[in-house]
Swiss-Prot record:
Ranges annotated as spanning the membrane: 243-267, 275-293, 309-330, 601-619
Phosphoserine sites (modified residues): 424, 538, 541
The gene coding this protein: CHRNA4
Cystine crosslinks: 161-175, 225-226
Principal subcellular localisation of the protein: membrane
Signal peptide: 1-28
Protein's name according to its UniProt entry: Neuronal acetylcholine receptor subunit alpha-4
Keywords in alphabetical order: Calcium, Cell membrane, Disulfide bond, Glycoprotein, Ion channel, Ion transport, Ligand-gated ion channel, Lipoprotein, Membrane, Metal-binding, Palmitate, Phosphoprotein, Receptor, Signal, Synapse, Transmembrane, Transmembrane helix, Transport
Assembly and interaction partners: Neuronal AChR is composed of two different types of subunits: alpha and beta. CHRNA4 forms heteropentameric neuronal acetylcholine receptors with CHRNB2 and CHRNB4, as well as CHRNA5 and CHRNB3 as accesory subunits. Found in two major stoichiometric forms, LS (low agonist sensitivity): (CHRNA4)3:(CHRNB2)2 and HS (high agonist sensitivity): (CHRNA4)2:(CHRNB2)3, the two stoichiometric forms differ in their unitary conductance, calcium permeability, ACh sensitivity and potentiation by divalent cation. Cells produce predominantly an (CHRNA4)3:(CHRNB2)2 nAChR.
Region described as Disordered: spans on this chain: 382-479, 497-559
């Protein structure tokens, strides 16, 4: 059937009637309920006095059940010693003037009423540090038909708390919140603990603190101002700091700075960066202290453990600078500025290195020492062998009975002229004239070239000889030519290559000061002297030779030329200078080794002290059960 057809007017009145009936019933029910609460409020507060205690008799005591629920631990201020919390204060009491029969008010068993309209106990926070002792936000109270009143206002309290930062950041604090009536004594209002512990069901976890325990206790106290006894309920909060933030940003950097201080003593003194490293560590620690002054609790009641550790680290770094300066002073000492005492040599070169398991490196200048010794022997050994006057050269009895005969050189192609001379090999040394040879050795017969007395000096590998030829005396001249007599000067070369090179340079310097031509030819190279040599027949019997050897005559050296004498003196000076430098070098090395031993001593000392300081930082909180 279409809407608006002939049957539409017949159905519309019944629908409207049903809708109107439903609306009337609902409105009547709401009106009845609102009318019941309104009548109840008028009945309860007609003649109600909120200033009087809700007791029938004046001697009755109002029992207030008290409880606390914590919502958030906002902050713990170590500097101002305050704890800020967000709590719900639970209070419950009975008011006999606020009772009714639910049957008279359409089964209304409870209503919410403004708390300003009823009597409230004046319970405040005794140890408040902010000024708001009482609850500032007055919420509505829940009123029941039997006169029971429940009131749970929220509040943010700043309570005083004695902060102990001895083990900071591994500390644990005990803070209290004391609640009680400010006006009424125990005879008027008595408190009953609603729960033995603080309700933490709605607690919002903190990122810095964790509540270990929170217990409420009932106490009574008589104050000096009044004769009455006042009850209170004190809640003790045991809170522990979460140390992760401070461990990463405070403790670990301090430990690393201490380790850098230890490494100062492991750094060699030769690098010259020990003082730089010490100053850098000290500056970094100073900047670090400026940054953490806001983190460490600024209280003078007790020094925090981390503050003691930072002070220890500062002293640690300062001492390292002082010790490093002393070590560098010892390292750069020399024989020209300081004399090493015997006890220093005994303690720091013998005793302490053995205790520290230190092994001194081997001597560095062995080659130079061998070179100096060889040059000393070259300068002090006789270049010509001594000969007794009027006798053949004497030898020891252990040698052969037939000494080598001297060799005489007769020039073949040199014509006999007045005052001729025989050249030396490679023209390095001028030959002596006959008169000089006669004056030098008028009666002695030339002896063979022999090695120096005794065994060969250590460090010498082989001997080389420098042959010097001079004319024989006129009485020794033979027919058909001029007889020459040769004598050789031996010099030795060290074994090592470096020493051989230095020895060769010294020998070359000697030769260059006495010659005007090239170097000497090698020993195996044939001599350019155009003389033929033959052995002089021995005119002395073997028995006479043995007898001559048994007699001792004072040795006599052949005179050297002035140039050769100056060369020998130069070699002697060079050898003495090198010996003095070697002695200075040895003393300097001793001082450097003493500095290294002192460094090693303080390295182990600082490692031990650093470990003890670290253990001292963590051990007390661990023993106290805070870690």
């Amino acid at each position: 059937m279409e809407l608006g057809g002939p049957g539409a007017p017949r159905l519309l009145p019944p629908l409207l009637l049903l809708l109107g009936t439903g609306l009337l019933r609902a409105s009547s029910h709401v009106e009845t309920r609102a009318h019941a609460e309104e009548r109840l409020l008028k009945k309860l507060f007609s003649g109600y006095n909120k200033w009087s205690r809700p007791v029938a008799n004046i001697s009755d005591v109002v029992l207030v059940r008290f409880g606390l629920s914590i919502a958030q631990l906002i902050d713990v201020d170590e500097k101002n010693q305050m704890m800020t919390t967000n709590v719900w204060v639970k209070q419950e009491w009975h008011d006999y003037k606020l009772r009714w029969d639910p049957a008279d008010y359409e089964n209304v068993t409870s209503i919410r009423i403004p708390s300003e309209l009823i009597w409230r106990p004046d319970i405040v926070l005794y140890n408040n540090a902010d000024g708001d002792f009482a609850v500032t936000h007055l919420t509505k109270a829940h009123l029941f038909h039997d006169g029971r009143v429940q009131w749970t206002p929220p509040a943010i309290y700043k309570s005083s708390c004695s902060i102990d930062v001895t083990f900071f950041p591994f500390d644990q604090q005990n803070c209290t919140m004391k609640f009680g009536s400010w006006t009424y004594d125990k005879a008027k209002i008595d408190l009953v603990n609603m729960h033995s512990r603080v309700d933490q069901l709605d607690f919002w976890e903190s990122g810095e603190w964790v509540i270990v325990d929170a217990v409420g206790t009932y106490n009574t106290r008589k104050y000096e101002c009044c004769a009455e006894i006042y009850p209170d309920i004190t809640y003790a909060f045991v809170i522990r700091r979460l140390p992760l933030f401070y461990t990463i940003n405070l403790i670990i950097p301090c430990l690393l700075i201490s380790c850098l201080t230890v490494l100062v003593f492991y750094l060699p003194s030769e690098c010259g960066e020990k003082i730089t490293l010490c100053i850098s560590v000290l500056l970094s620690l100073t900047v670090f202290l400026l940054l953490i002054t806001e983190i460490i609790p600024s209280t003078s009641l007790v020094i925090p453990l981390i503050g003691e550790y930072l002070l220890f680290t500062m002293i640690f770094v300062t001492l390292s600078i002082v010790i490093t300066v002393f070590v560098l002073n010892v390292h750069h000492r020399s024989p020209r500025t300081h004399t090493m005492p015997t006890w220093v040599r005994r303690v720091f070169l013998d005793i302490v290195p053995r205790l520290l398991l230190m092994k001194r490196p081997s001597v560095v200048k062995d080659n130079c020492r061998r070179l100096i010794e060889s040059m000393h022997k070259m300068a002090s050994a006789p270049r010509f062998w001594p000969e007794p006057e009027g006798e053949p050269p004497a030898t020891s009895g252990t040698q052969s009975l037939h000494p080598p005969s001297p060799s005489f050189c007769i020039p073949l192609d040199v014509p006999a002229e007045p005052g001729p001379s025989c050249k030396s090999p490679s023209d390095q040394l001028p030959a002596q004239q006959p008169l000089e040879a006669e004056k030098a050795s008028p009666h002695a017969s030339p002896g063979p070239c022999r090695p120096p007395h005794g065994t060969q000096a250590p460090g010498l590998a082989k001997a080389r000889s420098l042959s010097v030829q001079h004319m024989s005396s006129p009485g020794e001249a033979v027919e058909g030519g001029i007889r020459c007599r040769s004598r050789s000067i031996q010099y030795c070369v060290p074994r090592d290559d470096a020493t051989s090179e230095a020895g060769g340079q010294a020998a070359g310097a000697l030769a260059s000061r006495n010659t005007h031509s090239a170097e000497l030819p090698p020993p195996d190279r044939p001599s350019p002297c155009k003389c033929t040599c033959k052995k002089e027949p021995s005119s002395v019997s073997p028995s006479a030779t043995v007898k001559a050897r048994s007699t001792k005559a004072p040795p006599r050296h052949l005179p050297l030329s002035p140039a050769l004498t100056r060369a020998v003196e130069g070699v002697q000076y060079i050898a003495d200078h090198l010996k003095a430098e070697d002695t200075d070098f040895s003393v300097k090395e001793d001082w450097k080794y003493v500095a290294m031993v002192i460094d090693r001593i303080f390295l182990w000392m600082f490692i031990i002290v650093c470990l003890l300081g670290t253990v001292g930082l963590f051990l007390p909180p661990w023993l106290a059960g805070m870690i």
